[in-house]
A protein has these predicted regions:
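Positively charged n-region of N-terminal signal peptides that target proteins for export
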Residues: 1-2
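Bacterial N-terminal signal peptides
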Residues: 5-12
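Bacterial Sec-dependent N-terminal signal peptides
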Residues: 13-38
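Extracytoplasmic redox metalloprotein regions
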Residues: 42-43, 49-63, 73-291
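Short alpha-helical functional segments enriched in proximate histidine and acidic residues
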Residues: 70
Length: 291
């Protein structure tokens, strides 16, 4: 009586693993190239960006698998392997916000704000109107916390809808979010003193490719990307990291030189590491609550 579900599951698994097209089967027209060269895959499932290239084997395949587990496995608040979550956080794994290296639907839409089950999949940036941070808070509002610890606050969103018309008379509707923060862990911040920006997760696609490119190639492509008629001027973003000027390649608006500078482990999950050894809530009451 269990044969049908098992067969169906196997069929679904194989359908996701192989869509029947291999890179060797593709004839590329002159003047064109595959987006990832020989690493291009042709899956149409949600796992298309969450797999290694077909030719990755041996030690490199093991390295990819270990990195993929590090990315997807849920963090706990223990001190052992796979631990380190909190005391405050926004998501409990990289994959929780970036499902299959893509985007996870944020609770901003499904629950109208902060998630009710220890997960939100969004970042709430808070600051003063002049850009300075508040003394009892960092740059991100951590709306989740481990057991026994109070989150920094909770986000609520309400939407207003407005109807407009195209020149031909066809109507369309725009949705405007109105954010508010409640249950502040310390002194409440007045709305008129607060600048709040809510961001949904970015896709984590092609970062390894960017790291492998020669910086001069990126600079040459940027120089060609000039379209003044559209108000577009291609230019690279240069950043200073540890006193060294580098080409920005990763992060929001290319603000980081490489993936080691990504703040996700520290800022989003509260996991300390060799790059960011301090707790994300250093100096706040949650440090003692979570110890």
């Amino acid at each position: 009586k269990y044969s049908f579900p098992i067969c169906f599951s196997l069929l679904a698994l194989f359908a996701c693993e192989n869509d029947g097209i291999d890179v060797d089967d593709i004839e590329v027209p002159a003047g064109f190239a595959l987006s990832a060269g020989t690493a291009t895959n042709f899956l149409t499932s949600s796992y298309a960006y969450d797999r290694s290239a077909d030719w990755i084997t041996g030690a490199y395949d093991k390295r990819f698998t270990r990195g993929d587990k590090l990315y997807d496995d849920i963090r706990t608040s223990s001190n052992g392997i796979g631990g380190g979550l909190g005391p405050v956080y926004a998501g409990y794994s990289c994959g929780s916000c970036h499902r299959n290296a893509g985007r996870t639907q944020p609770t901003l839409w499904s629950e109208g704000g902060s998630g009710s089950s220890g997960f939100s999949s969004m970042l709430v940036y808070i600051s003063r109107k002049n850009g300075a941070f508040f003394q009892d808070y960092g740059r991100v509002l951590h709306d989740q916390a481990i057991y026994g610890v109070k989150p920094e606050g909770k986000l609520k969103v309400e939407y207003t809808y407005e109807t407009f018309q195209f020149p031909d008379g066809e109507t369309y509707e725009l949705c405007k979010p109105n954010y508010s923060i409640y249950e502040w862990y310390a002194d409440s911040i007045k709305p008129e003193d607060l600048f709040c920006t809510v961001r949904i997760p970015l896709r984590h696609v092609g970062m390894g490719q960017m790291m492998a490119l020669d910086p001069t190639e990126i600079e040459a492509l940027a120089a060609k990307s000039n379209y003044p008629e559209y108000g577009i001027s291609g230019r690279c973003n240069y950043i200073s990291e540890r006193g060294v000027r580098s080409l920005g390649l990763s992060g929001n608006k290319a603000q980081h030189a490489d993936l080691t500078v990504e703040l996700g482990f520290s800022s989003d999950m509260g996991v300390t590491n060799s790059r960011y050894p301090e707790e994300i809530c250093e100096g706040q009451a949650q440090v003692n609550q979570g110890s």
